[in-house]
């Protein structure tokens, strides 16, 4: 996919949602129950590790409440999902990323919206 960027200087920071993107959207009332482990969407762990090996910064975002951080971190660890930061409590509404264009006119932000529960396994940046 042509992003109109200089491929030689590609240095991505990836903001990626959890529920419905990395693992299947589950029942919000079940998330905090002891032993609950979300179902990982096929290709998730491999894609995250690929991005990490390329030096991309991986920032996970979720509408889950901050009070669920400990259980969420355990779920991520159990699933083998590595990341640089975890941003909790951003709510369930639409997300808007605002970023400037580079001086040469190249884009500095892109959006990908896979269908819920289809995951990121086939995503090529």
What are these regions (language model features)?
Residues 1-125:
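HAD-like aspartate-dependent phosphatase fold
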């Amino acid at each position: 996919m042509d992003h109109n960027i200089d491929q030689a200087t590609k240095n991505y920071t990836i903001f990626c949602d959890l529920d419905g993107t990395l693992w299947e959207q589950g029942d919000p009332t079940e998330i905090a129950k002891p032993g609950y482990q979300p179902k990982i969407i096929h290709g998730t762990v491999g894609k995250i590790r690929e991005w990490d090996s390329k030096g991309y910064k991986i920032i996970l975002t979720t509408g889950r409440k901050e009070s669920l951080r400990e259980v969420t971190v355990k779920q991520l660890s159990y699933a083998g999902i590595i990341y640089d930061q975890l941003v909790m409590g951003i709510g369930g509404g639409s997300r808007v990323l605002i970023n400037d264009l580079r001086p040469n006119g190249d884009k500095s932000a892109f959006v990908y919206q896979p269908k819920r529960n289809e995951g990121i396994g086939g995503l090529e940046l």
